[in-house]
């Protein structure tokens, strides 16, 4: 792969996710902390109006506005559609990028700790993630759906990925998570600098990759009303194994609903507040061990 010349850090794609938004504000106030000799680092506050309002979005979810067809559709005129076009104008598209790496900062009410969310398994990204999880075992790595036709901001770039941290409430700054996220960003930038110098560290360990397999909705009645909640046995237990027969939900009348799958899964984004409107109680993943150097 060619030399890294420009890196973009985006925060506040969702306006009430303060960790990323305030990190971007810090980096804009003290740009020297993210600059490296061999590449430029630029910062973008993703959704300024939503950030000012303390809301996830103004009219629609900005992180669902980056489908190529949507970016080319001049009839889409919501604030977030316009903002997506502006951001794409800076970052470029996957087939014509203006930057080499995109880091999109997010936070979650789920207990995701320090997570890297990938939309593809590019060898460069896998080696980066293997390095990050090797030096900090608390870093988890997820692989979601293939990015071809994706509407996420990260899909604008082949080397785009998300840093997702939690648990933290919406519209709240948590100093510990802020500092951990900040340090993770510095580690990533250091890695990119070493890559440009040809000094990539060799990783011998396998990478644990949590691969997305599907979503699960809450129990509902015939009117679509929620009739249950996350069972206390799995609340805040993201990335832990869920076996067939384990309790999954607790209904309003106190009955446990078990996981009826046939294989062990590893739930993530358990009880994410922003996913209630999307009909998602959690995401299921399967755990794979891969060799990033193969």
Swiss-Prot record:
Record's keyword terms, sorted: Hydrolase, Metal-binding, Zinc
Gene3D superfamilies reported for this sequence: 2.20.25.160, Zn peptidases (3.40.630.10)
Needed co-factor(s): Zn(2+)
Keyword Hydrolase tagged: yes
GO cellular component terms, A-Z: cytosol
EC identifiers of the protein: 3.5.1.15
Annotated S-S bridges: none
GO molecular function, one term: zinc ion binding
Superkingdom, natural source: Bacteria
UniProt-annotated binding residues for substrate: 56, 63-64, 164, 275
The reaction(s) this protein catalyses: an N-acyl-L-aspartate + H2O = a carboxylate + L-aspartate
Keyword Plastid in annotation: no
Membership in a protein family: Belongs to the AspA/AstE family. Aspartoacylase subfamily.
Protein name: Probable aspartoacylase
